[in-house]
């Protein structure tokens, strides 16, 4: 999707991302050019499940026994981020980037726009029960999708008039999860899907909100990294077709029955 946008001369003024979208946004903010998109694809192609979801019998057992608040350590994900994010602090990125996380105590979305990049990204990716919460300052944060996965309201309040939404897509929602990790991702994906519909519907008359096609490969699990190339190629082709058919403008693709709009706390959080 990102490659298709850059090929069609779409250049962002700023980026907002949640969960894996935050990781991609952070990379694009540091390398906002076509070559950067190629490098990002290469990074994803080099990753395996154990690089992000390293299952450990000991950690899992501690979680099951109630001695830990997570099943998977975020140490491997931290290593991936430290190796690849091309700046140490969010404000050092070439483009402004805003990372969405969820304040664990209040349950509200928080926008991380300054401070160390890696902790902010770990917080945005901290799927509750799967990864541990991340402490920034005196507050604990978890995955931004819990509160607000596609922060369209935030983008509008920051002055955006044209917004491109790049949804990951959740084809596995049509299948029953078969393990604890799948159950956690399934629950979060359901929340995300509903909130995307609600936000676009609530703001469609306020800004030009363009939703690119979501990934739609029903046989690919969210924890399966063996189909990364297939997913990247599908996303690129579908986004390119839509952009070409609409003269460079992506088209909204929202179900008719959207949910009620959700409230969002857009207050920035400064990560020390």
Positions of predicted regions on the chain:
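C-terminal domain-closing interface element
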Residues: 64-85, 210-217, 222, 226
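Short, hinge-like loop/turn segments at secondary-structure boundaries
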Residues: 31-35, 180-184, 229
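Conserved catalytic block of serine-dependent lipid acyl chemistry
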Residues: 21, 116-217, 233-236, 240
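Alpha-helical membrane-targeting segments
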Residues: 51-72, 175-197, 261-265
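Short beta-strand scaffold segments in enzyme catalytic cores
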Residues: 97-102, 132
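A short alpha-helix-loop-beta-strand transition element characteristic
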Residues: 85-96
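Patatin-like phospholipase
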Residues: 1-81, 113-123, 167
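C-terminal helical/tail subdomains of lipid-metabolizing enzymes
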Residues: 199-272
